[in-house]
Amino acid sequence: KLKGTGVRVTRVGDQIILNMPGNITFATNSADISASFYPVLNSVALVVNEFEKTYVDVIGHTDSTGSAEYNQQLSVRRAQSVSSYLQSQQVLPERLLTSGMGPNSPVASNDTPEGRALNRRVEIILTPLT
């Protein structure tokens, strides 16, 4: 369901991780979801609802440009935006845990524009109920 959307899907142990790059999710310095990203989030919601016996962590990440405090707040607001939208698509709120990591969990170097782009992302982690 997510093929061709720009969302990278990875399985780590029992978890399924959906990595959504920031460039397709939000405008710079904004927590407003890009209109072009709603169809992708609709597909994400279908996947999340398909795996109904899971907890859903929605985690916002930023690059290191700007202050750590600002980036922390931005990452939380972005995760909250995605979480709110998933709730509007019938994902139950009690399944959702929303957090922001700011610039603290980079997946690439913040020394290059390409690396910073990779670090600006929202991850959704599906963890089975135990």
What are these regions (language model features)?
Residues G13-Q15, R121:
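Conserved catalytic motifs of the protein kinase core domain
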Residues L2-R11, T25-I59, S83-S88, I124-T130:
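Periplasmic peptidoglycan-binding/anchoring modules of Gram-negative envelope and division proteins
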Residues G13, I24-T25, P113-R116:
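Short alpha-helical interface patches
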Residues A31-A35, I59-T130:
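Periplasmic OmpA-like peptidoglycan-binding domain that tethers envelope proteins to the cell wall
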Residues I16-P21:
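Short, aliphatic-rich beta-strand segments
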